Swiss-Prot record:
Keywords: Signal
Domain of life of the source: Bacteria
Keyword NADP: no
HAMAP family: UPF0319
Protein name: UPF0319 protein VV2_0960
Name of one Pfam family that matches: DUF2057
Family: Belongs to the UPF0319 family.
Cross-referenced PANTHER family: UPF0319 PROTEIN YCCT
Organism: Vibrio vulnificus (strain CMCP6)
Signal peptide: 1-21
Length: 215
């Protein structure tokens, strides 16, 4: 019986940590985020907000986006589009913001935006390491399926390619199957589960667990 209480504790702490662990990407209104990790990007935020957000998992992520700053000329607003960019990066438990070039006017933007330098920066202003490429499609550009293009790009193994969603899902569900097998197999079920979840916990969770046991 004594093993059940600490087991419940570490399970709760581990699940809580997994639920809150995420990367928040802030997307300004002059950036169109088409795809995140192979899926059409679903942003949160009010209609007229200057930026919106999307929650991404910790670890490696891939995005497809386009930058389009606008410039006033008389009564008109002129937008200048960058290339469609596919990029991958890794981050954990942080907020990220785009750091994008600013241009004096639309003429300068038209000359320079295709070779623009950009970054993703964290809460401390440090740039996140990334790999990027252009997501190029010849011919008609209207009605592009960016999710499909990203999947095709990943198959080519480009510098910004990531693994498929299927392999990620398999990795995530595998520990659950292992737990179920252990529950059915052994007489020492509680102890085995305790060891399993303790090994999976991060150092902060392990420290809290040890403090709880020593009470």
């Amino acid at each position: 019986m004594n093993i059940i209480k600490p087991l419940t504790c570490i399970l709760a702490m581990s699940i809580s940590g997994l639920a809150t662990a995420a990367v928040t990407l802030h997307v300004p209104d002059d950036v169109t985020l088409f795809v995140a990790n192979g899926q059409k990007a679903k942003l949160s935020g009010s209609l007229f907000a200057s930026s919106k957000t999307i929650e991404l998992p910790n670890g490696e992520n891939q995005i497809v986006f386009q930058y389009e700053p606008y410039f006033s000329q008389g009564n008109d607003r002129i937008g200048v589009e960058s290339n469609v960019i596919i990029a991958k990066f890794s981050a954990n438990d942080t907020d990220l913001n785009f750091e994008l070039p600013k241009y004096r006017d639309h003429r300068v933007a038209e000359q320079e935006i295709k070779q623009m330098q950009w970054q993703l920066v964290d809460e401390q202003g440090a740039a996140v390491t990334k790999s990027e490429d252009k997501l190029v499609k010849s011919g008609m550009q209207i009605g592009r399926d960016y999710a499909r293009e990203a999947a095709d790009y990943n198959q080519t193994g480009g510098i910004a390619a990531i693994g498929t969603a299927v392999s990620v899902a398999t990795i995530k569900t595998e520990p659950v199957a292992n737990v179920e097998t252990k529950v059915k197999a052994g007489d020492n079920t509680a102890e085995e589960m305790l060891h399993f979840w303790y090994d999976k916990a991060d150092e902060a969770t392990k420290a809290r667990f040890k403090a709880y046991i020593n009470q």
